[in-house]
Amino acid sequence: MYFKMITSAPWVLYPEIGEDPSKKWIFREPKISDGDGIYSLIADCPPLDMNSSYCNFLQSTHFSKTSILVEHKGDIAGFISGYQKPDEQDVLFIWQVAVSPRFRGNGLAFRMLKELLEREALSEVKSVETTITEDNQASWALFKKLDAMNGNHGQVSTFLDEKAHFKGKHDTEFLYRIPLK
């Protein structure tokens, strides 16, 4: 004895099967309506320092050309905030890199960084700078990868010292400067 079984085609039950992978992630400039979502994302990404939500609204408006957001099916999956240094416009300073725990393991941080650096508005950027605490292994790996892609000419120095600047309330921030090819 056998039973007839009627099932839908796999692409009907699981529409993501036929989904174009390039449409899975949307990389774009942040906008004012993203401010609260960015604030929530940063809160979900310790050890990143929390700023006020007002700061995240400023990042998504005043610094939208030098920041990038990636979304997946309407959810904010990641965000990089950055700015061009006022006295060195050819230097892009990366302030924070955040990827939602739900979306880690997809290479989003590096993809966001590459997408950001490929923008026409940043075509004059010759170096990337960021600060990283000693224990933030994810950030070290990300920026070492960027450095390797650009010839391994990056330099690391102490920027803000735990004792001299933070009076023991925050770990030392190391400045990583990466010249771009």
UniProtKB/Swiss-Prot annotation:
- Every copy of the N-acetyltransferase domain together lies at 25-181
Disulfide topology:
none
Keyword check for Transferase: yes
Pfam families per the UniProt record, alphabetical: Acetyltransf_1 (PF00583)
Q: Which UniProt keywords apply?
A: Acyltransferase, Transferase
What is this enzyme's EC?
Answer: 2.3.1.178
Q: Name one GO molecular function term.
A: diaminobutyrate acetyltransferase activity
| UniProt xrefs under PROSITE patterns | GNAT (PS51186)
Its annotated pathway reads: Amine and polyamine biosynthesis; ectoine biosynthesis; L-ectoine from L-aspartate 4-semialdehyde: step 2/3
Query: What's an example GO BP annotation here?
Result: ectoine biosynthetic process
The reply to whether Transferase figures as a keyword in the UniProt entry is yes
Q: What protein family is recorded?
A: Belongs to the acetyltransferase family. EctA subfamily.
The protein's name in its UniProt record? L-2,4-diaminobutyric acid acetyltransferase
Lineage runs:
Bacteria, Pseudomonadati, Pseudomonadota, Gammaproteobacteria, Vibrionales
Which gene is this protein's source? ectA
